[in-house]
Curated annotation (Swiss-Prot):
Annotated protein name in UniProt: 3-isopropylmalate dehydratase small subunit
GO BP terms in the entry: L-leucine biosynthetic process
Keyword set, alphabetical order: Amino-acid biosynthesis, Branched-chain amino acid biosynthesis, Leucine biosynthesis, Lyase
Classification of source organism: Bacteria, Pseudomonadati, Campylobacterota, Epsilonproteobacteria, Campylobacterales
Gene3D superfamilies, sorted: Aconitase, domain 4 (3.20.19.10)
């Protein structure tokens, strides 16, 4: 998993509340078990005008020239609602999204996202609206995020956010669940060696 310490990138506003996991990655694309290849299907029903993904919907912000190569999304409340599918953060990460800023996230999506290296940043609704309005007006659409400082830098504004220490350390060190387990491999083996078996 890629480390997240400081990231600067183009931010794209998605002015929708309650974006659910089926909108993020529709169910017909969930057949694969690898984390790669889902990015092309991200927001399928919003990004494309046809099922073959050959005609882009140019009214959708991610398809607009100024938001191409976006690595940060700024959206509205309850992002990631709906069914629990880890493919949703897989699709976002595979597309190149490193962070999402919103007033709130669905709990399961948030945990899945953080576990896959995707930073979820919760800001007050008025702060999110301020960022969205400025993104639409400004030619410079770059936002800088410091996980070390837990701050978002945009124009001359600084927005502070909170994140629990466990997920913060995992992101800073680039540790997913498997890497985190392997980090404690010696202790696990020592425990298994010294623990008594209850099988007879």
């Amino acid at each position: 998993m890629q480390k997240f310490i400081i990231h600067k990138g183009i931010a794209c506003p998605l002015e929708y509340a309650n974006i659910d996991t089926d909108q993020i990655i529709p169910k017909q694309f969930l057949l694969a078990v690898s984390k790669q290849g889902f990015g092309r299907h991200l927001f399928h029903d919003l990004r494309y005008l046809d099922d073959k993904e050959s005609v882009l919907n140019m009214d959708f912000n991610l398809n607009k020239k100024e938001y191409q190569n976006s690595s940060i999304l700024v959206s509205f409340e309850n992002f990631g609602s709906g069914s629990s599918r880890e493919h949703a953060p897989w699709a976002l990460v595979d597309y190149g999204i490193r962070a999402i800023i919103a007033p709130s996230f669905a709990d399961i999506f948030k945990n899945n996202a953080l576990g896959n290296g995707l930073l979820t940043i919760e800001l007050a609704k008025d702060e999110v609206l301020e960022i969205v309005d400025e993104l639409k007006k400004s030619q410079d659409k770059n936002i800088e995020i410091s996980l070390l400082e837990k701050r978002v830098f945009f124009k001359d504004k600084i927005f502070s956010f909170d994140l629990d220490n466990f997920h913060r350390i995992c992101l800073l060190e680039g540790l997913d669940n498997i890497a985190l387990t392997l980090k404690h491999e010696a202790q696990i083996k020592a425990y298994e060696k010294n623990s008594k078996s209850f099988l007879v």
